[in-house]
């Protein structure tokens, strides 16, 4: 089995994956949402300190699951890029110590590639029995919308080490814009779930009232690129123009209108990708990353995939956000290829360089 570690941002997570059949044997995750909600976003120093406290705590639970017998572990995998340097280092230090103690190889995993491999994981059960993967491999070629943290990208995957970057954001990411709008509205952090909740409630309670209208970013731009800064600013100005304090109805209308505009922007750019020469033989498309849990985004992209006869692949909702299970299933591919990193050469990086990741 492979022990995997995830600490790229504000989630401390460990997992055990079977090398033979890619089944998830054990998974534990501690989130820091409550600690960061007061600040409206991640505070790196707080995140680092909490990882230093919590990673050893959940390692004790993992050891107890194995009855303190770590001999079945044949490799340790850890996220080394991209992410916050002060949190990545906490995971890497633990991984190095485990590799030295167990005399097993180290596997460095790109966090973004881990999100892609989250497509293969089933939801964990309460008793943590072995969970078989949905499939043993990803369909290829595979078009991918990656909406995770600071990333909004369209990727074209031909093989494990052949992933082309098709489009990315010029400024804010899809997820960051949700966090910023939630902060403008005083709704706390993280913004994605709360904005979706307000939007859903508004559409349910006021079915005959159109939500606040916002411009779709880059509406007449035919280039494969994203931008959310203008939309974010339009929301800020709309909030300022409304009577204060905002009513629940106004908050819901803002959330619904913003969500519709942001998702329409995504759909329009994915449509351009589907119409491109590179995607003409594409049969499979996937949405991955924490923000891929948004129901409205899933629904609108599913409709687009049906229009273009593409099979849509979605990660289980339990594994959309950061987790060690996705790092583990990706690490299995590294393990099979003999792709190990000497302990003294392992490094972290806050960025994922194009020629490094793709």
From Swiss-Prot:
Keywords: Acyltransferase, Cytoplasm, Iron, Metal-binding, Transferase, tRNA processing. Pfam families: TsaD (PF00814). Binds 1 Fe(2+) ion per subunit. Its cofactor is Fe(2+). InterPro entries: ATPase_NBD, Gcp-like_dom, KAE1/TsaD, Peptidase_M22_CS, TsaD. Fe cation binds at residues 111, 115, 322. It catalyses: L-threonylcarbamoyladenylate + adenosine(37) in tRNA = N(6)-L-threonylcarbamoyladenosine(37) in tRNA + AMP + H(+). One of its GO terms (biological process) is tRNA threonylcarbamoyladenosine modification. It is found in: Cytoplasm. Its EC number is 2.3.1.234. SUPFAM superfamilies: Actin-like ATPase domain (SSF53067). Substrate binds at residues 146-150, 179, 192, 294. GO terms for molecular function: iron ion binding; N(6)-L-threonylcarbamoyladenine synthase activity. Required for the formation of a threonylcarbamoyl group on adenosine at position 37 (t(6)A37) in tRNAs that read codons beginning with adenine. Is involved in the transfer of the threonylcarbamoyl moiety of threonylcarbamoyl-AMP (TC-AMP) to the N6 group of A37, together with TsaE and TsaB. TsaD likely plays a direct catalytic role in this reaction. PANTHER family: TRNA N6-ADENOSINE THREONYLCARBAMOYLTRANSFERASE, TRNA N6-ADENOSINE THREONYLCARBAMOYLTRANSFERASE, MITOCHONDRIAL. Belongs to the KAE1 / TsaD family. This is tRNA N6-adenosine threonylcarbamoyltransferase. It comes from Helicobacter hepaticus (strain ATCC 51449 / 3B1).
């Amino acid at each position: 089995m492979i022990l995997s570690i995830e600490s790229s941002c504000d989630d401390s997570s460990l997992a055990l994956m079977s090398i033979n059949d890619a089944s998830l044997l054990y998974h534990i995750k501690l989130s820091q949402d409550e600690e960061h909600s007061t600040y409206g976003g991640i505070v790196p120093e707080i995140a680092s300190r909490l990882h230093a406290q919590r990673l050893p705590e959940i390692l004790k639970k993992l050891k107890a699951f194995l009855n303190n017998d770590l001999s079945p572990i044949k490799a340790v995998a850890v996220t080394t890029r991209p992410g916050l340097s002060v949190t990545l280092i906490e995971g890497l230090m633990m991984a190095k110590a485990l590799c030295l103690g167990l005399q097993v190889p180290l596997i460095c995993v790109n966090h973004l590639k881990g999100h892609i491999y989250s497509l293969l994981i089933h939801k964990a059960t309460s008793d943590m029995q072995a969970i078989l993967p949905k499939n043993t491999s990803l369909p290829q070629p595979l078009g991918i919308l990656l909406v995770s943290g600071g990333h909004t990208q369209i990727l074209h995957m031909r093989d494990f080490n052949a992933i082309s970057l098709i489009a990315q954001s010029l400024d804010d990411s899809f997820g960051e814009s949700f966090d910023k709008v939630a902060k403008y509205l005083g709704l706390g952090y993280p913004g994605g779930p709360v904005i979706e909740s307000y939007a859903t409630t508004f559409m349910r309670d006021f079915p005959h009232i159109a939500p606040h209208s916002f411009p779709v970013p880059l509406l007449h731009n035919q280039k494969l690129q994203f931008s959310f800064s203008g939309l974010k600013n339009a929301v800020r100005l709309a909030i300022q123009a409304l009577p204060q304090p905002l009513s629940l109805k106004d908050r819901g209308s803002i959330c619904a209108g913003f969500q519709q505009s942001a998702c329409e922007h995504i759909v329009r750019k994915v449509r351009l990708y589907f119409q491109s020469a590179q995607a003409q033989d594409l049969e499979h498309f996937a949405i991955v990353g924490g923000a891929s849990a948004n129901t409205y985004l899933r629904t609108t992209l599913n409709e687009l995939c049906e229009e273009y006869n593409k099979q849509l692949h979605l990660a289980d909702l339990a594994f959309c956000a950061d987790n060690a299970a996705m790092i583990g299933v990706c690490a299995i591919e590294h393990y099979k290829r003999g792709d190990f990193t000497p302990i003294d050469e392992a490094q972290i990086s806050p960025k994922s360089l194009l020629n490094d990741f793709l």
